[in-house]
Amino acid sequence: MDIKAAIAKVVDRKDLTTEEMIEVMQQIMTGQATPAQIGGFLVALRFKSESVGEITGAAQVMRQLASKVDIDDPHLVDTCGTGGDGSNLFNVSTAAAFVVAAAGGKVAKHGNRSVSSRSGSADVLEAAGINLDMTAEQVARAIKEIGVGFLFAPAHHSAMKHAIGPRREMGIRTIFNMLGPLTNPAGVTKQVIGVFNPLLCLPLAEVLQRLGSTHVLVVSAADGLDEISLACETHVAELKDGKISEYTLTPEDAGIMRRSLDGLTVASAEESLTLIEAALTKVTDQTSQKARDIVALNAGAAIYAADLASSFKEGVEMAQDAIGSGLAFAKLKELASFSACFKEEE
């Protein structure tokens, strides 16, 4: 299907088939569509609301065109959100990645620089001294040896360059916000995905079911966070054993006291790093305790998704142990020194 015909169909509020979406995405990702056509198509999709079939088709094309990171591990997991929640919270899922690694998981952390927040995962890792310009082989080695590696989206999704201009100029959420977590270059089948709207939980779980994922938690908190919140209940769509179930999680389910998010918002990557370090080292005040608790909640979900724990509660307990032992913070420092070696080689 030609992108012009696709725009006309979507403007009429008709869903594209998965096959039609594949054809249109191939035109976008190979430079055959003009910036005006890309912008018009993305806005029309957003107004209609993207269907499960459309998201699936788009994700398939992005996966095919991505440069792969070769990792074969039964506990390989990703912690990646859609962003766009407007909270400016510190990088919780990035901190959680080091906790999961310390608990015995392997984390292929997929992420990018900030688009809508004050600090994207790439921004805070760079502030921590981690080299983002590692090759796919070097990232794979980091994951195998340390338990965590960072997959910088632009390095693995070079075909995305055709859509960057229209996305930046429009400045609104589009289907591409959802595609980041669905297109991990390491091909993870286990993950926790945070989304900005609870209505997206079930559709994205259905997309991942179609794409072959095995254990996924798609989470969206009642306060709008694209994380499991410390302050309120969180809606979850869980894909496990081929079935999807929906339920609500609370901090109390994991034995953690509910607290406000005051003090956990940041204005820069450096401020985010300060809170991550506070969460992973010694609790000195209420803010560092809250930071530690929200990281433990989200790391616990990822430990459970990685099938290292039999329940969310057990996952959170394992996360708390990994933080308390100092191992999680050690993983952060280890990745920084490991990645610096490759910087010196260049």
Curated annotation (Swiss-Prot):
Listed pathway(s): Amino-acid biosynthesis; L-tryptophan biosynthesis; L-tryptophan from chorismate: step 2/5
InterPro entries for the chain: Anthranilate_Pribosyl_Tfrase, Glycosyl_Trfase_fam3, Glycosyl_Trfase_fam3_N_dom, Glycosyl_Trfase_fam3_N_dom_sf, Nuc_phospho_transferase
Main EC class the enzyme belongs to: transferase
Binding-site residues, Mg(2+) 2: D226, E227
GO cellular component, one term: cytosol
Gene3D superfamilies: Nucleoside phosphorylase/phosphoribosyltransferase catalytic domain, Transferase, Pyrimidine Nucleoside Phosphorylase, Chain C
UniProt binding sites for 5-phospho-alpha-D-ribose 1-diphosphate: 81, 84-85, 91-94, 109-117, 121
Residues the entry annotates as binding Mg(2+) 1: S93, E227
GO molecular function: anthranilate phosphoribosyltransferase activity; magnesium ion binding
Binding of anthranilate 2, residues: R167
UniProt key word Glycosyltransferase: yes
Cofactors, names only: Mg(2+)
Keywords: Amino-acid biosynthesis, Aromatic amino acid biosynthesis, Glycosyltransferase, Magnesium, Metal-binding, Transferase, Tryptophan biosynthesis
UniProt: anthranilate 1 binding residues: G81, N112
GO biological process entries: L-tryptophan biosynthetic process
Summary of subunit composition and partner proteins: Homodimer.
Purpose: Catalyzes the transfer of the phosphoribosyl group of 5-phosphorylribose-1-pyrophosphate (PRPP) to anthranilate to yield N-(5'-phosphoribosyl)-anthranilate (PRA).
NCBIfam families on file: trpD (TIGR01245)
Annotated family: Belongs to the anthranilate phosphoribosyltransferase family.
Protein name: Anthranilate phosphoribosyltransferase
Species annotation: Hahella chejuensis (strain KCTC 2396)
